[in-house]
Amino acid sequence: MRLLPVWTAALLAAQAAGVALTHKLNGFTITEHPDAEKRELLQKYVTWDDKSLFINGERIMIFGAEIHPWRLPVPSLWRDILQKVKALGFNCVSFYVDWALLEGKPGEYRAEGSFAWEPFFDAASDLGIYLIARPGPYINAEASGGGFPGWLQRLNGTIRSSDQSYLDATENYVSHIGGLIAKYQITNGGPVILYQPDNEYSGGCCGQEFPNPDYFQYVIDQARRAGIVVPTISNDAWPGGHNAPGTGKGEVDIYGHDNYPLGFDCANPDVWPEGNLPTDYRDLHLEISPSTPYALVEYQVGAFDPWGGPGFEQCAALTGYEFERVFHKNTFSFGVGILSLYMTFGGTNWGNLGHPGGYTSYDYGSPIKETREITREKYSELKLLGNFIKSSPGYLLATPGKLTNTTYTNTADLTVTPLLGNGTGSFFVLRHSDYSSQASTPYKLRLPTSAGQLTIPQLGGSLVLNGRDSKVHLVDYDVAGTKILYSTAEVFTWKKFHDGKVLVLYGGPGEHHELAVSSKAKVKVVEGLGSGISSKQIRGAVVVAWDVEPARRIVQIGDLKIFLLDRNSAYNYWVPQLGTETSIPYATEKAVAASVIVKAGYLVRTAYVKGRDLHLTADFNATTPVEVIGAPKTAENLFINGKKAHHTVDKNGIWSTEVGYSPPKIVLPVLEDLKWKSIDTLPEIQPSYDDSPWPDANLPTKNTIYPLRTPTSLYASDYGFHTGYLLFRGHFTANGRESNFSIQTQGGQAFGSSVWLSGTYLGSWTGDNDYQDYNATYTLPSLKAGKEYVFTVVVDNMGLNENWIVGQDEMKKPRGILNYELSGHEASDITWKLTGNFGGEDYVDKVRGPLNEGGLYAERHGYHQPYPPTKSKDWKSSTPLTGLSKPGISFYTASFDLDIKSGWDVPIYFEFGNSTTPAPAYRVQLYVNGWQYGKYVNNIGPQTRFPVPEGILNYKGTNWVAVTLWALEGSGAKLDSFKLVHGIPVRTALDVEGVELPRYQSRKGVY
């Protein structure tokens, strides 16, 4: 092992001596006090040292998942996601709050129905999941405006600064959401253990003071005023030391940062660039914040995908099970004490809530799919890691050392980072020195153990590390009082039951492994063939060697049964904590010990004992053998999803049964055959259209970043329109000298726009992911002098920009018309009107929120909601597969019934066909029961399949689907195909409660 650098050694020595440390880092002066108890704490429930948090006095590794409930607007499904997180072996969830969804109008905070947070907090509490609250006010999150409401574009001050106008604007939101979070803190019996002020406060420019200690202290104090007393934690965008403990005003209690080491090149999922695996984060942590636990508040487990990208399945491959094995185990080598994976469940950018850099799906290539399915192997791999950490309290007591490729192996092709314990177990994280290597490399280990330095395997043969894999080898590992002297196979879990101990080990295909137990007991093979297993007593330890096989084998040494599994078999094992019928305890040492091991395939949600009955709730996607290992002594009967299951008990005490799988026949309607009704949703292009009720575009802008180049503002947010399609009408009197019209529109990446002159189509910008704005020039027909004409302009607002760099105020980039020029005229010759969603910030549909609707005629009238007035004379029978024969926008709606059998979780998608080459330029908005659940851009993509969850879809009744079809080319547009399809039905214990689906009602004052 190489010696620590002089500075690091001195730092550690000073810590040990209890000396306060002062040092310089990146321009900051950092003063670290080594004793966390001497910091002023506002509560006693959550404390910490340099290794981990303590919750109620018990040391705990926080292994968490990032999920955003607001990206799944069906609160009853939040429990489903949280159960799937708990089943990973995780104990925590980190979440953002999207301010834009809660305060669509300044001063009016609304958090009801799908926007209420109480069901989420209650579910986390019921399931024993701690929460890290990250309400911003700025969140980034690939959300429109980075979570900022659009009305901040009118703010006369710099966002995320100490400008009083900005601070005042945040008060209503923070007082409400902060107050609610405060009620659910651990101090009040709730699940919230940490609070993050702001997010990624890591970069500034343009003359703004950065970092600004006054600003950040205000954000912290603001939370404290709302009642927040749990420790604060930061999320620096890189380990830059911003607001670290000891930096003075604006410092947080616990420093953390994020990291997305493999990046976002989903088009090349097999490419792992040289140098992308972090190796120095432990050293950086010791420089920045040595007396707090190392915290990775966001660590990559998926990737975002832009408009025109390769799609999220490619992102899932980029950050798949191999990525998890190498990169996540690498984080363990740093001694990470707080780790949250972004995104463990991504969800959907429904209702225009996404930023312009992404499309409707926010699947993120996550372990839990957008559809809530857990069929990606990366979910199962993550479960192995989560349960290992949950079973290994000694990990937090081990001290990380320096990586080396010579000390612990016999080959320089491999690198090992040790975490050395002092009687509490040691961990050796092994990977290829070239982390991207796909070679299979044989090796031997040289490990320091309590029995001395050992060369492993001791019984002959060789270990092997396959390509893009990593191992955590163990030394002096405690299993309920039995010492595992070493294990080359990896631990999934272990438990002490009333009739003995169980240790579950696994290995990859083609691997050879060896285990030594400090015991003089004999080895018995109690299940499976013993011919592939060898053993020997060596200096007071039983050494067992085996080759990994698909068939399970169980070896018994004294009162310890060791399950030898291959990795794919281990994927089918679950370790639910025993709870009650309605709740699961938090992952305390006692609660973790009170768990059972279940082999059951797709998903095990909960386990509890009621009287003499052991109850499991579980999901199945195939006929599945179910085994219970370590059934409680008091249990006699087995119930699965409330039904008694006949079971047998073998000689090893394992309960066995089988759950059948007979999926129901699912008959979905053929969308092409529905009784579609349509209406022109762009009547504004007709010269006779009366726009007198529309707002006049007569304001000067309040935008402080983008000065006007037009006589009056044509920035939509100046008038309260922040979401969806925007419409402008410009009136002028011709003088006969008009020859062309130039217009610069801006809607964000991949936006589109179209222009008409008094019913004559002039042209469109069809969109490109590389363009946020576009300047087009259109040739005009001959105009008659003295006659009134009107331009009609449609702009697709793809969401507001995020606001990452302080001082740029990127979220203030306007949407609408930036500039225009009509030949032969002054700009002031044109008088403009505009509209967006009906009511703007006084939006009508409070159930579906402030961003759900855009400015099209049908949207303004609410025709996208169930039961629109299709019998009026303006409607005709027409389908989107017939479409339009010329440029324009039509609206189509139809109803259909579903009858999905209860007890089955069935993913359902709306799928658009795209078979024409080159792809015609048209845009579609998909509404389901009034909720906007898709923006489809045919000529850009990539998304063609749009999942809609149960709860938005009525699985047992009538549903309404609506689409807007915008033809941006002279030949018009029609859908190639439009289908309703389903995924694999899962037999489930899940119970889904639908959300409110308000019907169409005539809107007062609508135009």
Swiss-Prot record:
Catalytic reactions on record: Hydrolysis of terminal non-reducing beta-D-galactose residues in beta-D-galactosides
Subcellular localization, as worded in the UniProt entry: Secreted
Major site of localization recorded for this protein: secreted
Keyword NAD applies: no
Active site: 200, 298
A Pfam family annotated for this UniProt entry: Glyco_hydro_35
UniProt signal peptide: 1-18
Domain of life: Eukaryota
GO cellular component: extracellular region; vacuole
Glycan attachment points: 156, 405, 422, 621, 740, 775, 914
Keyword Hydrolase: yes
Record keywords: Carbohydrate metabolism, Disulfide bond, Glycoprotein, Glycosidase, Hydrolase, Polysaccharide degradation, Secreted, Signal
E.C. code: 3.2.1.23
Disulfide bonds: 205-206, 266-315
Binding site for substrate: 96, 140-142, 199, 260, 364
Gene Ontology biological-process annotations: galactose catabolic process; polysaccharide catabolic process
Enzyme class: hydrolase
Listed InterPro entries: Betagal_dom2, Betagal_dom2_sf, BetaGal_dom3, BetaGal_dom3_sf, BetaGal_jelly_roll_dom, Galactose-bd-like_sf, Gly_Hdrlase_35_cat, Glycoside_Hdrlase_35
Molecular function in Gene Ontology: beta-galactosidase activity
Purpose: Cleaves beta-linked terminal galactosyl residues from gangliosides, glycoproteins, and glycosaminoglycans.
PANTHER family attached to this UniProt entry: BETA-GALACTOSIDASE RELATED
Similarity section: Belongs to the glycosyl hydrolase 35 family.
The protein, known as: Probable beta-galactosidase A
Source organism phylogeny: Eukaryota, Fungi, Dikarya, Ascomycota, Pezizomycotina
